Amino acid sequence: MLFFVNDYCEGAHPAILQKLLETNMEKLSGYGTDKYCDSAKEKIRKACGCPDADVFFLVGGTQTNATIIGSVLNRYEGVLAAQTGHVSCHEAGAIEYTGHKVLTLPAENGKIKAESITDYVETFYGDESHDHMVFPGMVYISHPTEYGTLYTKKELEEISEVCHKYELPLFLDGARLGYGLVSPETDVTLEDIARCTDVFYIGGTKVGALCGEAVVFTKKAPKHFMTMVKQQGALLAKGRLLGIQFDTLFTDDLYTRISKNAIETAMKLKRALQEKGYQLFLDSPTNQQFVVLENKKKEELGKEVQFDFWEKYDEDHTVIRFATSWGTKMEDIDALIELL
């Protein structure tokens, strides 16, 4: 069986496992107060060009999204997000569970536009009864998006400008950030993201770590943020496990280097799909590739390949997703191409 169902099929990069083994018997303080967490935080600040950033390590993406959004918003506020965004569709109502509504915006290939934020906010405040409604309190985007697409630097700057105008904190979900940063089609750097956002996170779970996400508040974290992390069940007692992983990922540019494999394998698959005449659902420059398959072909392929159902295309076709990762082997791509 070939596995292309997600980008976390593998365990962790061998360098991380080796470092965890080497440090296993060290006696260290808990909850992210150890020397490895401190070292990882400094390396992340340096990589972001943001020396005063507040950095925290959380265990997973959904906990991270819910904790950040819940910590930033007032009780009467909601978060603006693409109607196709992860927090809108694939987190089992985790944001609503914190007491905050997801306020959806129209999306084009997974991306929202600055104009959509402006339209929403001005329409909201133009309604004389807005005190009876959920206030827009922050903006959520992801990079790459749920569809593997990327914001350009110009688009990111425009969204940032609108967010500042209306005093809406901008939160960027970076679960797959490594893959976005190394795409040959991007002009966005980690420093650009730190400059344009109020908070973002660097994904580890999908980019080489066993688990974990590094949250970066570019200015200042909400007061008592760590306590709120604890309330959300996202604080790891053995915080060293996250610190060691991110310290390793941000040593010798490992995070960037291993991310390139996902792009190289995905682009080879993309070229093969195009050469074989398959219809791409959209043009993704990252590790997620979406293709329209005849239902008969989907059933046939599913006997030997694990892939992700995305959506119904029509009565005879389905959109599926192939996802590559830092650990995808080129020979598995070749085997998949043969089956196609």
Model regions and ranges:
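Conserved N-terminal alpha-helix of the aminotransferase class I/II PLP-enzyme fold
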Residues: 13-61, 83-88, 94
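Conserved core of the PLP fold type I
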Residues: 54-73, 103-110
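Conserved PLP-anchoring active-site segment centered on the Schiff-base-forming lysine
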Residues: 71-89, 118
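Conserved C-terminal alpha-helix-loop-beta "cap" of PLP-dependent enzymes
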Residues: 74-76, 267, 272-340
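PLP-dependent aminotransferase-class I/II
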Residues: 99-137, 141-144, 151-158
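Active-site C-terminal subdomain of aminotransferase-like
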Residues: 108, 135, 142, 150, ...
